[in-house]
Amino acid sequence: MNQAAAPTTSPASSITYTESGGHRLAIRDWAAPAGAPRGMVLVVHGLGEHSGRYERLAAPLIEWGFRVRGFDLYGHGLSAGPRGGMDTESRFLDDLAHIHRLTVNELPAGMPLILIGHSFGGLISSHAVAQKVVTPDALVLSSPALDAGLNPFQKLLIATLPRVVPNLRVGTGFQLERLTHDKAIVEACRNDPLAHQRIAARLARFLAEAGPDTVSKAPSWTVPTLLMWAGADSFVAPAGSSAFAAKAPASVVQSQEFPALYHEIFNESPELAAPVFATLRAWLERTISASNQPA
């Protein structure tokens, strides 16, 4: 398997909209691969960003023969909702279930759906699988927010504020220079009008509670999963991923830490991202081949 970095050219994408829970969600579909698609990849982005930031992931997936779709979470990107907001306790799981169902219904019989979630999107995706809200054929988690790395004071605030002011939004305080070693990506994010640094109290509570709950479900995990995380992550605690990996059955979950990488492993500098994409491609080849074997 060649350890080539993601292509530098950006594939074209188109935007459509759907209604979920009375609000509008933006769906992004990238250009279809040449020939018959091998599967559909559904991407769930992280906190404060949007699906349009996943061109570096979409490009190689298309090259490998996959259709790629993303969507903007509630309160993010081109979707409705206050930036960083969360209007109901189940908003993100409900919306993912809606997009997942819509996507599955579009696919030809037998075509696998692979769910890829990064950071907060990794938390949403894994929590949805743990709660059996969605049942993808396979799951990829990139630096998932399974441990928010909160200090005791932050935990106290999160336990109190959502009961009093659930819609109060505050700054996340993200240090964007620690997103990736690729300075062009950092600057693009810093100047992106669709990105934000806001988080509501209700969303913060979901972030704090859903991670440990998902990790507790790891021993009974059944969905084929690739878990990759950055060892030099300052956005989420790597301990959440390592805890999940230690509890999950090794026959179902393949885990790999990349010690030198920052948070956005798919957006890392080409030389750092190359082994990430090589790992992803090799795992997809094995997983898709296994899913095509007769029962």
Locations of the language-model features?
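Short alpha-helix in the alpha/beta-hydrolase fold that links the catalytic acid
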Residues: V223, A237-A246
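Alpha/beta-hydrolase-fold enzymes
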Residues: H118-A200
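N-terminal cap/lid segment of alpha/beta-hydrolase-fold proteins
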Residues: N2-A32
